[in-house]
Amino acid sequence: ADLWAISSEDHYLRVHTDRGEELILMRLADAMRELGEDNGLQTHRSWWVSHNGVADTRRTNGKLVLILKSGQEAPVSRTYQPNVRAAGLA
């Protein structure tokens, strides 16, 4: 399956892929460490997005949002906006 994004929910991670979503018990920091920096980047304190998972970008009320290939919206916080822009995702 192609990994598009990971979002944290309490002590779990929701893994977004081309085959749907699944909840796993893991910390976001541990998942990002295993994935490495070449595959994607953190866009928010609770979101990691794969470079190949982004279909589009949009601004909603002045806030940057990445639209995943699934249609799901991944928020981009001000803290991570420079990294998202540098990666060419916005």
Each model region followed by its residue ranges:
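Basic, polyanion-interacting recognition surfaces, primarily
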Residues: 1-90
